[in-house]
From Swiss-Prot:
Region (Coil 1A): 95-126
Gene behind this protein: NEFL
SMART domains: Filament
GO terms for biological process, alphabetical: anterograde axonal transport; axonal transport of mitochondrion; intermediate filament organization; neurofilament bundle assembly; retrograde axonal transport
Record's protein name: Neurofilament light polypeptide
Role description: Neurofilaments usually contain three intermediate filament proteins: NEFL, NEFM, and NEFH which are involved in the maintenance of neuronal caliber. May additionally cooperate with the neuronal intermediate filament proteins to form neuronal filamentous networks.
The record's note on its domains: The extra mass and high charge density that distinguish the neurofilament proteins from all other intermediate filament proteins are due to the tailpiece extensions. This region may form a charged scaffolding structure suitable for interaction with other neuronal components or ions.
Region Tail, subdomain B (acidic), annotated ranges: 446-556
Amino acid sequence: MSSYGYDPFFPSYKRRYADSPRLHVSAMRSGGYSSARSAYSSLSAPVSSVSVRRSYATSSASGSLLHSVDSLDLSQVAAISNDLKSIRSQERAQLQDLNDRFACFIERVHELEQQNKVLEAELLVLRQKHAEPSRFRALYEQEIRELRLAAEEATSEKQALQGERESLEETLRGLQARYEEEVLSREDAEARLLEVRKGADEAGLARAELEKRVDSLLDELAFLKKVHEEELAELQAQIQYAHLSVEMDVSAKPDLSAALRDIRAQYEKLAARNMQNAEEWFRSRFTVLSESAAKNTDAVRAAKDEVSESRRLLKAKTLEIEATRGMNEALEKQLQELEEKQSADISALQDTINKLENELRTTKSEMARYLKEYQDLLNVKMALDIEIAAYRKLLEGEETRLSFTSVGSITSGYTQTAPTFGRSAYSGLQSTSYLMTTRSFPTYYSSHVQEEQIEIEETIEAAKAGEAKAAPAEEGEEEEKEEGEEEEAGGEEAEEEEEGAKEESEEGKEGEEEEGEETAAEDGEESQETAEETGEEEKEEKEAAGKEETEVKKKA
């Protein structure tokens, strides 16, 4: 913020700058531009008092100047008159320039009003377009409900089919368990069959071996019989030969016959004993082999019966397994067909849902785009309103400055023609009045500009409140609560800012000695900067509100 200061010896003002902190007020009021206009109208009284003080100071200064002219020569008077003429010509040129600028400002205001009307018409059209998608939303919601019901029915059917599938899977698992048990029993039977076959083979081998041993024993028995017969024949031949020799030598050896009889008896006993032992061994061996053969025959018969029974059971289980397998294949085929049908229905429903979601997304994007355009138009409208207010303030400032200059010129002309009485007495009063006006005016103007900025920001916040009222009905209550809190906080901040401004004005009245002045162009730039800052803040707030709206819609 800058303050203005005037030099009474120069009708044209000098520009001096004195920096002071800027004010940022976030208060929200619904006064609009009426508060700004009332503030502008309320400035007329202090400005008039300042103009009176300025005219008095100017008249005093002109009186002191004429008092000094009496003591000057004619050449100096001519130089002073030429300076005054040049100053008047400069003032006329400046006045003409200001009039031209005022006309340009008025034309610009008219153009901005026309643009504002056009933008308001476009805003109405966009609001109408924004109100239209509610019908589509109802239709889409109805279709979504129907599709959700269809999806729920499909889900229930899927659950029923899954239950049936689970029951079939339980049956299949039971059949598979039975099949595995039968396979295990078959493997056990086959193992037992192999063992029986192995035992039968071993029994056959043992029987063949025994038969071979019987044959060998029979051959040995026949050989022994033959040997025995040969021995008997030899013994008989020897006995006959001995008998003949005994008969021939009877006279010589009478005891040989008795010895031969003893020997014959001994050999007969030995042969009979050997024969009896061989027959007993053969009979015992034959009985043992017969018993083992009978036992092996019974075991082979039992094994054959068990193998035939196992084959019969295996054939029956194989037929049952084939039937179960066929039933399982049929059920799996039916289940696969049901799954394919269900997946096709689900994919069709999902495609329909995706299509509706895409349409809903496009509709939401269009709504967001319309809202963004609406926000842009509102921002442009607010910027234009701020610019118009800034131009209006500039024009009023120029009017006040022109009134100051016109009053000063009139009073200076009047004092040049009037007689001068008591100028030495009024010289101190003139200097003190000038210092009072020049020191108090910058402080007054700085407080005035601060109040204007506060009013501008209040109008911006009022526009924000209007936009918040035009927002969707779902967020109305929350936004009203937030706006109420912001209004309370903004009211407190505004009161604090006003108290700070009053304190600054009092401090400026008491101890401020620096004089400064800021041009209308810089005021316009500051107003534009504040407008841009507020526009950016509004955009951020609207983006946050849009995000909250989308989240609320998603939750709904």
